[in-house]
């Protein structure tokens, strides 16, 4: 008889309000919390996004989730977990909503419905003597919000884009289930080889004109897909360029996507 695999998820910490679930998860990891520990909150006071941006956190209308991973992988492969998480969130939302709506991925890790951002993901890594001590994957999903400030006009919620109110607990459970499956596939090769085709099928930038914003300037090209390492392949007049997520921001030539 086949033995049932143990779940990745070992313990949950839930807070009504916290500064940020990523910060809580970091504190727990430093205190010795196990691989597979996860943190949820009803509201955040200091939510964080990629490249130091803040994340709008309204109480009990969104999902604020962070989990602790302690994988035996090379540090340079850790950033790919951001894309693994994006794929998992897209699958989870689709599983809960049904086939009517496709949550696309704007490279590397924003989830968009109707070209509006409804989810952001932030992965942070702590090294000890050159090896991974822990990785925190933070996921913020706008679920049932009914309005947003004008200054974040590219943001929206699942409710605003689909008219569906979702049970946040059900969606959290689905995100964790999907991530566990995608994470196992990632660990087989320690890259995105087994997930690349699936990711590219949801990549809203694929075959579209994009603007790559770098510290030294910007340039345009056509996004073709991703490499097994999660780099965005951009076709330009000078040939194909490979863009790493930590260095740049990518926009559609005529707007957010």
Q: Which residue ranges define each predicted feature?
A:
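Long, positively charged amphipathic alpha-helical accessory segments at protein N-termini or as interdomain linkers
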Residues: 75-102, 113-257
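N-terminal lobe of the biotin/lipoate ligase/transferase fold
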Residues: 1-98, 102, 119, 166, ...
